[in-house]
């Protein structure tokens, strides 16, 4: 089996993606009134980076970005949610493999596929995995963390569904469509 190297382009994407994730996570959030639960724009951006550069870039961007955001905001990381940011980035990247955004096409069928995938991924990560890890790692009360998880899942579904879809459409539209250039 041939060893696959990580390209410089992917490493740069992870670094820039993590930095933008931190900025969005710190400064472009809308509070919900429920403790530690916000409408996050950073996950829509994570969906874009993941769809363009793949599951590994999504995983690393989510992990590094969320960890730095937590350290700079709270002084320490809430590892159960950091892990889930990595998982969701990987899942967005996996969904993005089928989208083929570089072809310049992001059809309604692709939008539906992306949104069904992100809905399932957000429910798995935020409503199931994150609260379960909170209980196992931090001994948090189940009713509190599952409520936070469900609220976060719904808010991320909405944020990624609207902002993420717009970002993916804008990116695909900026690409040259295959066969659109003709030799004269």
Curated annotation (Swiss-Prot):
Keywords: Cell membrane, Membrane, Transmembrane, Transmembrane helix
Pfam families associated with the record: ECF-ribofla_trS (PF07155)
Locations listed in the record: Cell membrane
Domain of life: Bacteria
GO cellular component terms listed in the entry, alphabetical order: plasma membrane
Membrane topology qualifier: Multi-pass membrane protein
Transmembrane segments: 11-31, 44-64, 77-97, 116-136, 148-168
Matches recorded under HAMAP family: UPF0397 (MF_01572)
Family: Belongs to the UPF0397 family.
Entry-linked NCBIfam families: PRK13661.1 (NF010182)
Name used for this protein in its record: UPF0397 protein SAOUHSC_03020
Organism name: Staphylococcus aureus (strain NCTC 8325 / PS 47)
Lineage: Bacteria, Bacillati, Bacillota, Bacilli, Bacillales
């Amino acid at each position: 089996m041939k060893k696959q190297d990580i390209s410089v382009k992917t490493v740069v994407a992870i670094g820039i993606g993590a930095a933008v994730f931190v900025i969005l996570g710190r400064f472009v959030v809308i509070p919900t009134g429920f403790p530690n639960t916000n409408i996050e724009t950073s996950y829509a951006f994570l969906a874009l980076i993941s769809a363009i550069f793949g599951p590994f870039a999504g995983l690393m961007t989510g992990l590094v970005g969320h960890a730095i955001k937590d350290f700079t905001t709270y002084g320490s990381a809430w590892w159960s949610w950091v892990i889930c940011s990595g998982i969701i980035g990987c899942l967005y990247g996996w969904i993005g493999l089928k989208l083929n955004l570089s072809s310049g096409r992001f059809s309604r069928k692709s939008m539906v596929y992306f949104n069904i995938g992100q809905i399932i991924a957000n429910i798995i990560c935020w409503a199931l995995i994150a609260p379960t890890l909170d209980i196992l790692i931090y001994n948090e009360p189940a009713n509190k963390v599952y409520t936070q998880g469900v609220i976060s899942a719904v808010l991320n579904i909405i944020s990624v569904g609207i902002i993420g879809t717009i970002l993916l459409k804008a990116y695909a539209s900026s690409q040259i469509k295959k066969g659109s250039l003709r030799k004269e």
